[in-house]
Swiss-Prot record:
Locations listed in the record: Secreted
Protein name (record): U-poneritoxin(01)-Om1a
Species per Swiss-Prot/TrEMBL record: Odontomachus monticola
Post-translational modification comment from the UniProt entry: Truncated sequences of this peptide have also been found in the venom. It is possible they have been cleaved in the venom.
Signal peptide boundaries: 1-27
One GO cellular component term: extracellular region
Length: 64
């Protein structure tokens, strides 16, 4: 029994969907790791606290 062209096309699309999904999951995990590393670096450098102080100073100067 010879598979039809439609069966072959379905298998190709199915394999492409599986490959795309696996690449997307890896990209999301990498992005999450990068975001966490950036947040940790900013927290360790004290930049977040500095930014809060600047915003408080601006609010005081604007009278809000």
């Amino acid at each position: 029994m010879k598979p039809s062209g439609l069966t072959f096309a379905f298998l190709v699309v199915f394999m492409m969907a599986i490959m795309y999904n696996s690449v997307q999951v890896t990209a999301d995990a990498d992005a999450d790791a990068e975001a966490e590393a950036l947040a940790n670096a900013l927290a360790e450098a004290g930049i977040l606290d500095w930014g809060k102080k600047v915003m408080d100073w601006i609010k005081d100067k604007m009278g809000k």
